[in-house]
A protein has these predicted regions:
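Surface-exposed peri-terminal alpha-helical interaction modules
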Residues: 1-82
Length: 82
């Protein structure tokens, strides 16, 4: 079994190769990174909303509230990042 490293766990080699600017514009890399980050945040929001929905259906309101609070915090981060 191989040792798990931070880089391997996060698949950093793949993640960091996903930014492929198409022009020589200085701001393009920033644009790509910000928008890719927002897509990842949106993916997490969807996950949290599904989790909250399941928890509410099960009557687990405190964990559902925590999931919805995470959604709110993620939205705040997204708003402040651009």
């Amino acid at each position: 079994m191989t040792d798990m490293t931070y880089a391997r766990y996060l698949a950093l080699d793949i993640l960091l190769s996903c930014q492929k600017p198409q022009s020589a514009e200085d701001d393009e890399m920033l644009f790509i990174v910000i928008h890719q980050t927002k897509e990842l945040w949106l993916k997490q929001i969807i996950r949290e909303l599904y989790l909250a929905k399941r928890q509410i259906a099960a009557g687990a309101l405190v964990p559902a509230y925590k999931a919805l609070a995470r959604v709110s915090r993620i939205q705040a981060v997204m708003t402040l990042s651009w």
